[in-house]
Amino acid sequence: MEALSRAGQEMSLAALKQHDPYITSIADLTGQVALYTFCPKANQWEKTDIEGTLFVYRRSASPYHGFTIVNRLNMHNLVEPVNKDLEFQLHEPFLLYRNASLSIYSIWFYDKNDCHRIAKLMADVVEEETRRSQQAARDKQSPSQANGCSDHRPIDILEMLSRAKDEYERNQMGDSNISSPGLQPSTQLSNLGSTETLEEMPSGSQDKSAPSGHKHLTVEELFGTSLPKEQPAVVGLDSEEMERLPGDASQKEPNSFLPFPFEQLGGAPQSETLGVPSAAHHSVQPEITTPVLITPASITQSNEKHAPTYTIPLSPVLSPTLPAEAPTAQVPPSLPRNSTMMQAVKTTPRQRSPLLNQPVPELSHASLIANQSPFRAPLNVTNTAGTSLPSVDLLQKLRLTPQHDQIQTQPLGKGAMVASFSPAAGQLATPESFIEPPSKTAAARVAASASLSNMVLAPLQSMQQNQDPEVFVQPKVLSSAIPVAGAPLVTATTTAVSSVLLAPSVFQQTVTRSSDLERKASSPSPLTIGTPESQRKPSIILSKSQLQDTLIHLIKNDSSFLSTLHEVYLQVLTKNKDNHNL
């Protein structure tokens, strides 16, 4: 039986050595165990899928003891090294233990005797490992021999390799210090960190590192040495950062004792030099000022006390004719762009326009264009809000001619200056529009203008009583050519006083350039009479019969003129009504 059991242990030992070649012998074993684990969340034990034979073995290297459960359910075995941190507690038939990772397990034994025996063996092994660790701590504090190993303990290959690596790094560090003589500032930082590291090393290592420490001091005095990885950290730093660097160097010093320091030499400057431009930027930053964008609106309104809001530039049609001193309109950003350009741009130019002789409280966008452009006559529309625009077909029939004579001032109703026009309304007339029909002579035009002056002023005398006291000025000499499709060109030429041939919402007054006709001006023109708001609404309109009475002399001479004029008149009023409804 003993031979069979001995042969079985040898077979088991050979199987264990396949997993761990440092296993030397089997200390004890038991036939049937099962492993449980404790779940802290559920506060209960959970059975694992590990069960089989328990082996307690000895090893030739640290840790010197361990145990394993060879699982017969699957290929996952339990391997647990035994050290001083392992804690056991016996609860028959369970043996509880907690490892260094604070995981709690429980081993269930089929035989209670095996449970007691394994528990006693584990207690002895943990006590032995505790004594071994205490002895190793005392050996580190006591003087060592030349090879760094004490007489009364076995040789540890891993410890020898670790110490040999430290010796190699120290020698390599000394060689690199001699080969790089121009980096004295970081040497002081590295020496501060190295002294702290040497204090923590065992006394045997201090004896060996003492010559290298003296070597650093000697090379520092003669050549100036430093660690290669510390050199870029000092370039371009101010005094405040230099005071903080010794603490940082002492924290980074243990990382320098790594193998292959020359590989770190190539990689360290890349990470360290990233901080150099930031330090240089920090030193140059007070000399650099933030660029400030100065708009023309801020320069124009620099004398104003209120802070400007968003500046909306005027249209390209307006910009050439605006005076240089006129401030740009300031509107809040919540308004839409189209309403801002048509309604919210209300400003008074600093230089008085030649068309004005009285202060004006406010001007609309269209009236501003009319006053500042001497070669552009606005098309007056009865809609004071400026929302209705003439159509393309109407503009093809009505073309405004440029103003070319001396401009004089004359009182005008405020409602007559409110203009609204499209870009096509401001175009200049062609030279053909100034050519008069050959059938009309100068004498006929004088007679027609005289008769028209007497007829027009009679029905419009009652309108002067409702005149608005606030008046605008109006240019005296205006000319307008009325090309009609399908009819010969008819040019109505009268004086500035008796020039009412059309409704005020359609045309400007037309005058002749003859000085003889200007002398006959005796009464104000109906266009200069300012009608109140109630009369400018679409509800009070001149009927066809009233217009026929006013233009009776033209009806007798040319009946197509009245039809064409009334057609255009109704088109404008219809579109004004549609715009009001919208």
Swiss-Prot record:
Location(s), subcellular: Cytoplasm, P-body; Nucleus
SUPFAM superfamilies xref list: PH domain-like (SSF50729)
One of the protein's GO biological processes: nuclear-transcribed mRNA catabolic process, nonsense-mediated decay
Reported tissue expression: Detected in heart, brain, placenta, lung, skeletal muscle, liver, kidney and pancreas.
Residues bearing the modification Asymmetric dimethylarginine: 376
EC number(s) given by UniProt: 3.6.1.62
Domain of life: Eukaryota
Catalytic activity: a 5'-end (N(7)-methyl 5'-triphosphoguanosine)-ribonucleoside in mRNA + H2O = N(7)-methyl-GDP + a 5'-end phospho-ribonucleoside in mRNA + 2 H(+)
Class of the enzyme per the UniProt entry, highest EC level: hydrolase
Modified residues (Phosphothreonine): 348, 401, 528, 531
MF GO annotations: 5'-(N(7)-methylguanosine 5'-triphospho)-[mRNA] hydrolase activity; enzyme activator activity; identical protein binding; kinesin binding; mRNA binding
Region ranges (Disordered): 132-154, 172-214, 513-536
Any single Gene Ontology cellular-component annotation: P-body
Swiss-Prot/TrEMBL keywords: Cytoplasm, Hydrolase, Methylation, Nonsense-mediated mRNA decay, Nucleus, Phosphoprotein
Chain positions with Phosphoserine modification: 62, 142, 179-180, 315, 319, 334, 353, 422, 522-523, 525
Biased composition (Polar residues): 173-196, 522-533
Subunit structure: (Microbial infection) Interacts with rotavirus A non-structural protein 2; this interaction probably plays a role in the sequestration of DCP1A in viral factories. Interacts with rotavirus A non-structural protein 5; this interaction probably plays a role in its sequestration in viral factories.
Role description: Necessary for the degradation of mRNAs, both in normal mRNA turnover and in nonsense-mediated mRNA decay. Removes the 7-methyl guanine cap structure from mRNA molecules, yielding a 5'-phosphorylated mRNA fragment and 7m-GDP. Contributes to the transactivation of target genes after stimulation by TGFB1. Essential for embryonic development.
Family: Belongs to the DCP1 family.
Protein name in the entry: mRNA-decapping enzyme 1A
Gene: DCP1A
